[in-house]
Amino acid sequence: MLAQIRQALDEAEGRDPELALPYLREAADRITQLIDEAMATAVLHGQASLRAAGAQAGLTENAVGPRLARTHSLAAYADERGRVTASAVARARYDLENGQPRLPAEQLESLRFKSRRAPG
């Protein structure tokens, strides 16, 4: 993942700002994914709370749940609102300790802005 981030940043370097934007967006998306996965690992294996993991990443506690819901290890524990809660993390830890972690049902995509207006 870090190699892909470096490659995207290398591609952006020296380009006109307009041409650099897609590469910078790719790097930012991959960094966000890396942060989210690190938070998931911290709450699952490091025994960090949602609040503590979020604080370490510079996020509020409310921002952590939706981001954890996009991770490989915790996506299957998201609620109907698309959030991972403290009780879901406790369940995920229990399942992991018993060797039966849930697997995500589908590939998750990162949150992205989607324009409501048609281009043009």
What kind of feature is each model-predicted range?
Residues 43, 53-54:
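The alpha-helix within a helix-turn-helix
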Residues 92-120:
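Helix-turn-helix/homeodomain-like alpha-helical modules used for DNA recognition
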Residues 14-28:
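Short, Lys/Arg-enriched N-terminal segment that forms or immediately precedes the first helix
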